[in-house]
Amino acid sequence: MAEFTALFGPAGNSESFSAMGYRKTLQVPEYLEEMGLDACEYQCGRGGNISQEKAAEFGAACREKGIYVSLHAPYYISLSGVEESKRLNSINYILQAARAVNAMGGERIVVHSGSCSKISREEALALAMDTMGLAQKALDDEGLSNIHICPEVMGKINQLEPWKRCFPSAPSMNVSSHAWILVTSIPALSAA
């Protein structure tokens, strides 16, 4: 049986980060350690333009403090967009996010699926599954098979949310009407 580890941390910085005198992104791991947390989600929701060098520096600071890092990909990703160009651009955004989190030493990118727009949920789901397959192939082709794409849902009526139907064997826990948490084993952190 697989061993599971629950990690806790914020997505981005809270008001207490600056209230406690912290100012720089590289201080996030120290802040999290002081707060007794062991994870963080680096926010690129409005677009991420972090260099590989800065990402690696942030990741090293996180490992030094035993902080597991994931990354939230841009909100404008649309896995179920009816315009093929938007879906293909979404794959590029996923690749950019994957490169950044990989440089940080993380393995997970959080991705919103987008909305159903003017098509049925079934059509949107088919498009999203196709886009996810293309995104996974792009990750594999680039040597980033270690990166997990983690779909996140928002509980909005027009959002595509039936991920559990797509991945019925994935262990999960329905924590609210707003999200599915995919429970996976997380490897031990190393200072390497």
Region spans (language model):
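Charged, low-complexity C-terminal accessory regions
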Residues: 1-4, 156, 177, 185
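N-terminal pre-domain/capping segments
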Residues: 1-96
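Active-site-proximal loop/turn and secondary-structure-junction residues that shape catalytic pockets
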Residues: 14-16, 44-48, 73-77, 113-117, ...
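Alpha-helix capping and helix-coil boundary motifs
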Residues: 16-24, 117-120, 191-192
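Active-site acidic/histidine proton-transfer and metal-coordination neighborhood
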Residues: 64, 80-177
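Non-cysteine beta-strand/loop elements that form the S-adenosyl-L-methionine
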Residues: 67-71, 177-182
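A short alpha/beta connector and helix-capping loop motif
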Residues: 167, 189-192
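Alpha-helix capping/termination and helix-coil
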Residues: 173-174, 186, 190
